[in-house]
Amino acid sequence: MKYTELKDKSIKELEELLHAKKAELFELRVKLKAMQLSNPNEIKKARRNIARIKTAINAHYSSSVE
């Protein structure tokens, strides 16, 4: 997921996507603790995607204020 894909979406779409990615991160962490996660690097990727989504949301809010 790239930032350029996210900046064209609406705030509502971004918030829904953020909620889904947080749930995905939770599931990955549960799998990690249960020793069922084959690639622990997926947690890092999920965290980075969440950060990208939050950045896009903040950019939308700051552009609407100006």
UniProtKB/Swiss-Prot annotation:
GO terms for cellular component: cytosolic large ribosomal subunit. CDD domains: Ribosomal_L29_HIP. It holds the Pfam family Ribosomal_L29. GO terms for biological process: translation. One of its GO terms (molecular function) is structural constituent of ribosome. Keywords: Ribonucleoprotein, Ribosomal protein. InterPro entries: Ribosomal_protein_uL29 (IPR050063), Ribosomal_uL29 (IPR001854), Ribosomal_uL29_CS (IPR018254), Ribosomal_uL29_sf (IPR036049). Belongs to the universal ribosomal protein uL29 family. This is Large ribosomal subunit protein uL29.
